[in-house]
Amino acid sequence: MLNRNYRGLLGTKLGMTQVWDANNRVVPVTVIQAGPNVVTQVKTPDSDGYSAVQLGYGEIDPRRINKPMRGHFETSGATPRRHLVELRTADAGNYRPGQQLTGEVFDAGQVVDVTGTSKGKGFAGVMKRHGFKGLGAGHGVERKHRSPGSVGGCATPGRVFKGLRMAGRMGHDRVTVAGLTIHAVDTERGFLLIKGAIPGPDGGLVFVRSAAKRPAPEPAAPVAAAAAGTGEEASA
């Protein structure tokens, strides 16, 4: 059973730039247009067997929506959206269909995971695609310098094993970069400034959510308040 509260948003990668931090150091950041997202469905353990929120992002011509999806959006009271994503979170009951979400759901310094579609490289050889060494530059090698070499024996095994790394289309894969830090949140323009690079080209769709491997720290304020109260009583 999921027992963590996650935050997530669909957005658009705008590009990279650099900013100065509090220590006057240059920080490379990626700018993301985060939202606005709209809640199109709320899933609960009673009705769906698990707790999740479905988010919609991006405008689309309503005439391009089929009847099942049109009914789905009408149920939530939201206008049709181009992209949909599901975010599993324990506090899905706090959301309501039609609710608008912006970059304010995140805080500066928060650690997030970013998912996007990597840039397509087209058909690539094994040296570029898999980092093969290639064959020798001389010593009798003729026009095979970037070849992978042997891919299987003649009699044994007499075939090519499944999954053997070969040349082929490179890139355009779903990639997740984990453990990135939000440098700043621009609430006026709806921008997220995330330290480092994220997958995909400028203008590509990305999904930003709370880091899965780094749970949020427990708040220390109640503990400090309780300790202070104990001290006052003891002194009295």
From Swiss-Prot:
GO MF term (any one): rRNA binding
SUPFAM superfamilies in UniProt: Translation proteins
Its job: One of the primary rRNA binding proteins, it binds directly near the 3'-end of the 23S rRNA, where it nucleates assembly of the 50S subunit.
Family, similarity comment: Belongs to the universal ribosomal protein uL3 family.
Biased composition annotated in UniProt, kind: Low complexity: 221-236
Disordered: region residues: 215-236
Cysteine pairs bridged by disulfides in the record: none
GO cellular component: cytosolic large ribosomal subunit
Keywords in alphabetical order: Ribonucleoprotein, Ribosomal protein, RNA-binding, rRNA-binding
Biological-process GO terms, alphabetical: translation
Oligomeric form and interacting partners: Part of the 50S ribosomal subunit. Forms a cluster with proteins L14 and L19.
Pfam entry (one): Ribosomal_L3
Name the record gives this protein: Large ribosomal subunit protein uL3
